Amino acid sequence: MKKFLKMTAAFSLGLSLAFGLFSPAQAAPDTSVSNKQNFSTDVIYQIFTDRFSDGNPANNPTGAAFDGTCTNLRLYCGGDWQGIINKINDGYLTGMGVTAIWISQPVENIYSIINYSGVNNTAYHGYWARDFKKTNPAYGTIADFQNLIAAAHAKNIKVIIDFAPNHTSPASSDQPSFAENGRLYDNGTLLGGYTNDTQNLFHHNGGTDFSTTENGIYKNLYDLADLNHNNSTSDVYLKDAIKMWLDLGIDGIRMDAVKHMPFGWQKSFMAAVNNYKPVFTFGEWFLGVNEVGPENHKFANESGMSLLDFRFAQKVRQVFRDNTDNMYGLKAMLEGSAADYAQVDDQVTFIDNHDMERFHASNANRRKLEQALAFTLILARVPAIYYGTEQYMSGGTDPDNRARIPSFSTSTTAYQVIQKLAPLRKSNPAIAYGSTQERWINNDVLIYERKFGSNVAVVAVNRNLNAPASISGLVTSLPQGSYNDVLGGLLNGNTLTVGSGGAASNFTLAAGGTAVWQYTAATATPTIGHVGPMMAKPGVTITIDGRGFGSSKGTVYFGTTAVSGANITSWEDTQIKVKIPAVAGGIYNIKVANAAGTASNVYDNFEVLSGDQVSVRFVVNNATTALGQNLYLTGNVSELGNWDPAKAIGPMYNQVVYQYPNWYYDVSVPAGKTIEFKFLKKQGSTVTWEGGSNHTFTAPSSGTATINVNWQP
């Protein structure tokens, strides 16, 4: 759903909002902690578990793996789930306005200490898994994890786990004794290791040089034992493992290294999640400075998960921290990403994380960080704050960006910026669901508006720390009146006076000033703000959030197919739960009509799957191509494009697992279904179809498969 309107715009926040945190009694269904499909109303706080708080010293590793002073940042420092529970219960997180936490991968990691260039390294970070069905004892037990879930939910905080199914742990093909040989366990039972891999659980194609997407998927990431997702044992194991964590009550998943796993397998993984217990899921696909990445957008639009918005993070750092771009560049990024992502509001924004240098430098002006936080918290998308950012932590690359949090002060300006703005995501639907418009801009100043129905929020930012800005000619969607700065002048903001037609009186925005103004009003007509999940099979219940649906059941439309009655399992003014009807697989627009027949806006690009999904590798031999031609796959199911060359799967690969003129691609297809398919060559708008009759293949009911055929001239 495109939500950046390419015209001048501004955020307006009205006086009608009370600025306290929502209590459980006040929470609308769409803003509730029980809403696992929608994080648009949430603020995520990313916690590197080992570096946050040591609540139970008894579970700390012993010997050379542990440094209680946290001087050696490659060793365990003692943070655990009990420490997070303590900071939930003492009000540090709730007081900041945090409504979701993203914690380190909770699974059991290797115990070996690995010496790299004379420096000891441990699995403190959680990314060196050995058993995806057990916990990391340095973080806590299963009971401790359940206590964390319960404590978080009691304080209206959702829990997201990091999950890294790309690999296990460091391994060497030449030295079976290196570390733990990448060994994989199933709840304590050994499945296999990297050497003597008779079951083919892992890839053995060498290390990636990152030169192509294919190279990054089917070769090892550094020295990490790369899991073979086309292996049925690996596939079923990983899908069973995530179901275990879903059963433990998690509310979301952050998928590590999605650029480095087969896209078809990941779509089948998301189908398994959505068909079981759907939760908000977002992946990590790194983008560098000024990198746009069409494959990144395609993945976000078609995989069933959203992404960490590195494009956003890199541009915000350029504009607010490094001064290497200006507000016009920031605006162009916002408009570009809104056009490229089908559901831009589901992408997760941030200004720093564990894979980047900290935003704040030790001697830098703190106002830069404070402005970046304010900008991020009010924008469309789901904001995530890296632990310690509110304490102005600094640090370069890994591991210096992963130090222990120095304090839990609630008096820093950064903490208070978050505290004042985070609650608005639940109290003003313009911030959670609204369109975005630029209203006033020059090199240093951006004023933008979020609007949803009659709800408005306006943000003004002057990044010039030395010169005030004279603002004239500003027009907003705010009703006539006077609006106080929601930040209360914390960042030198001012009151805004608005006359008839939304015209604001001229004013001066202070040097380094940031102000937020808002207005809220009831929404009389049905307006959809969010749908989740955005991909599932018929019969799965999805959640539609917004405003103005009314209290009596109406009708939900998937394209022209109407759903009513018992197939709508819940209908409230801000939320509808509905079962996907028995329609053919494909892309559908969703809309709602209330009991009186008044129709809502259209929410587009919902994918109905043809059924349960499995990952199948399609291989075609001896398909020669001319320079500039690529090979694609299509067939008689929507997952293969329904014979439409424009929707065909590809371009296929031909370098790593199979080599030219043989091609391959891993695709998510309906389980147990007999599929007809063909290959085709594309070069620009020119399409050359494979000859002969259609190939046929029956997909397995579970696990994975490979279908290998010859090109038919």
UniProtKB/Swiss-Prot annotation:
> Where's the active site on this chain?
256 (nucleophile), 284 (proton donor)
| InterPro entries with a match to the protein in the record | A-amylase/branching_C, A-amylase_C, Alpha_amylase, Carb-bd-like_fold, CBM20, Glyco_hydro_13_cat_dom, Glyco_hydro_b, Glycoside_hydrolase_SF
Q: Which residues form the signal peptide?
A: 1-27
The cofactors required by this protein are:
Ca(2+)
Its BP terms in the Gene Ontology are: carbohydrate metabolic process
GO MF assignments:
alpha-amylase activity; cyclomaltodextrin glucanotransferase activity; metal ion binding; starch binding
Per UniProt, the keywords (alphabetical) are: Calcium, Glycosyltransferase, Metal-binding, Secreted, Signal, Transferase
Q: Which reaction does it catalyse?
A: Cyclizes part of a (1->4)-alpha-D-glucan chain by formation of a (1->4)-alpha-D-glucosidic bond
**Binding-site residues, Ca(2+) 1:** 54, 56, 59-60, 78, 80
Record-annotated residues binding Ca(2+) 2?
Answer: 166, 217, 226, 260
**Top-rank taxon:** Bacteria
SUPFAM superfamilies (alphabetical):
(Trans)glycosidases, E set domains, Glycosyl hydrolase domain, Starch-binding domain-like
Checking Pfam families in the record gives: Alpha-amylase, Alpha-amylase_C, CBM_20, TIG
Residues annotated as site: Transition state stabilizer: 355
Q: Where is the CBM20 domain?
A: 608-713
One GO cellular component term noted in the UniProt record for this chain = extracellular region
Q: What is its main location?
A: secreted
- The catalytic activity of this protein is classed by the Enzyme Commission as 2.4.1.19
The residues listed in the UniProt record as binding substrate, with positions renumbered to this chain, are 127-128, 167, 220-223, 254, 259-260, 354, 398, 402
The entry sums up its family as follows: Belongs to the glycosyl hydrolase 13 family.
PANTHER family, per database record: ALPHA-AMYLASE 1, ALPHA-AMYLASE FAMILY MEMBER
Q: What does this protein do?
A: This endo-type adsorbable amylase is capable to digest raw starch.
Protein name, per record: Cyclomaltodextrin glucanotransferase
- The record lists the organism as Bacillus sp. (strain B1018)
